[in-house]
Amino acid sequence: IFYAIVFFFSIQIAFSQSLPEVTLDQAWKDKIRALAPEKATFPAKKKNFLVFSLHTGFNHWVIPHTEEMIKILGENSGAFTVTGSKDITEFEAKNLKKYDAVILNNTCSIGDHRNLFWDKLKENTSVDSATSMKKALELEANLLSYVEKGGGLLVLHGGVTTLNNSWDFSRLLGASFDYHPKQQAIQVRLEDANHPLVQAFPADGFNHVDEPYFYKNAYAELDFKPLLYFNNSEIESQRKGQELTEGKTYVAWIRAEGRGKVMYISPSHNAQSFENPDLLQFYLDGMQYVAGDVECDETPIKKN
């Protein structure tokens, strides 16, 4: 209760402004460990996760904090073994087989193709661009096949931009990134308070400072089961000409793809958000979902 009160008031103070970077030290790790769940919600066999944290585009300062938070969730609960990497060879088909699920941790791409694999491969100037692009497409295909055959995929915040111009990836995930207004306090609400994956939260959701993401491409198809959202009318500084004054934009969702499970969680740009134990529980439950440990309603809303 004490942490929840402190968290609430810190959010109010920081309203409509960016939060300062947090030092990733032992004190911060200890704080998160004390707040993290001590057991898994859905008892299951221990699973292996890859948390992939390479960025070629925007460098979210929260990347190392997010990776550490994921590792703490695995250790505290005993539900997961977590391997961290920035090596794109992890997306070779033989290497993906080592993991029950993959987490894309703010894996922002950049440049003309908005393709993380291409961005990294083109650094090797001894290989021509056509060969590099062929390899990039191969790694993307490996990821799609991995999920189709039963692997899990959890994409966090800026990870939505990993392959931002790829319609195949957009359909797999359920969206591509369009833009975000300034950081601000956001009231995140529950789409269905009875869904098993949102039981960590109170009925009215939670408030935190974050970038409110808006989406494009496959998002318009709404081929996913939404979990969290914000009201568009509450978001300040929207892009001129694209202002949304009605309806909602989803913040987290799930979808089945073949035998695999996919989840997107937008929170958060800021490590301060992880000081909310409810959000840590949501992350842990989401990891269990993509690992195949949770039976729940995945029915997509689909826009007709």
Regions found by a protein language model. Give the residues of each.
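Bacterial Sec-dependent N-terminal signal peptides
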Residues: 1-18
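Extracellular ligand-binding/catalytic regions of CAZymes and related secreted enzymes
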Residues: 18-44, 64, 72-77, 235-236, ...
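Catalytic beta-strand/loop cores that center a nucleophilic Ser/Cys/Thr
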Residues: 28-37, 171, 175-258
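Short beta-strand segments enriched in small/hydrophobic residues
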Residues: 46-57
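Short alpha-beta junction capping motif
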Residues: 49-50, 96-163, 259
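Solvent-exposed loop/turn segments at secondary-structure junctions
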Residues: 55-58, 88-90, 107-111, 153, ...
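Glycine- and acidic-residue-enriched helix-capping/strand-helix junction motifs
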Residues: 56-68
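A short, well-structured beta->alpha microelement
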Residues: 78-93
